[in-house]
Regions:
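...the same signal can extend to comparable exposed beta-sheet modules
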Residues: 1-253
Length: 253
């Protein structure tokens, strides 16, 4: 059994294991992780976790969904920055790694996207088709797209060779992560089906059954559909009674 230091598709430090030239798998080296967040976190907080020595002398990098984002993020990792670090927000998994032996540090941000199955699993093709929302294709990679034009989605064919999709049924909801131009591990979404929404604030929160849920950064909703019920300027707190909706929850509460 052999171990080779590497990085996973999200840019996190990892170890690749092989046995007699056969790949066993690549696994994140969590022993190097010094902090983890699922909400907005200040540039000062991340700076303190990385440490002054590492920020000044180590090779430091930053990635969003596996895409190099060092130029956008690292200037904001500063001891006097009390604002949320670029890209960090509700529902974004931000992880900070420091490797003192190799003098390296990495900040990674992983978004979670809603995907809906387009059809039942095809046993003949051994695959399932999904539409994943809040994304767009940019060259060979995918990036978050928050445009309200109804076109913020990407279609994926997921093979049974890569993931167990044998139980996927049409309209099933899943929580997707995406990196390196490909689907990464995904899980079924917790769904509140056929519920009334008592209030909705665009880009902020939704209230269902007396419970207020904050929107994930990658939350997606059909802006044109909202206009049917709320008018052209649907950016205030509004009432959506007399209509039922499906509300999808991520794993971060």
């Amino acid at each position: 059994l052999e171990k080779e230091p590497t990085a996973d598709d999200f840019g996190r430090p990892a170890n690749k294991w092989t046995y007699k030239n056969t790949d066993i798998g690549t696994y994140v080296d969590y022993s190097l992780m010094v902090a983890e967040y699922t909400n907005g976190v200040s540039g000062k907080e991340v700076y303190n976790k990385v440490g002054k020595t590492a920020m000044d002398k180590y090779d430091v990098a930053a990635y969003v969904d596996g895409n190099d984002a060092s130029k956008a993020i690292l200037p904001n990792v500063a001891k006097d920055n009390k604002d949320d670090l670029t890209g960090t927000d509700t529902g974004v998994l931000t992880q900070v790694f420091v490797n003192d032996d190799e003098k390296e540090a990495v900040v990674t941000e992983i978004n979670t996207y809603l995907g809906i199955a387009d059809s039942d699993y095809s046993a003949k093709k051994d695959e399932a088709d999904f539409t994943v929302y809040g994304l767009k294709k940019s060259g060979k990679v995918h990036v978050m797209d928050k445009a309200d034009d109804g076109k913020s989605y990407v279609s994926f064919k997921v093979s049974g060779e890569d993931f167990d999709v044998s139980k996927v049924e049409e309209d099933d909801a899943y929580l997707f992560t995406v990196a390196a131009g490909e689907v990464q591990p995904f899980v079924p979404a917790e769904t509140i089906k056929g519920t009334e929404i008592t209030s909705f604030k665009k880009g902020s929160n939704v209230t269902v059954g007396g419970t207020k849920y904050d929107f994930s950064k990658a939350a997606y909703y059909d802006n044109e559909a909202l206009k049917v019920y709320t008018g052209e300027n649907n950016n205030d707190t509004i009432n959506l009674k007399d209509t039922t909706y499906n509300v999808y929850l991520d794993t971060y509460g």
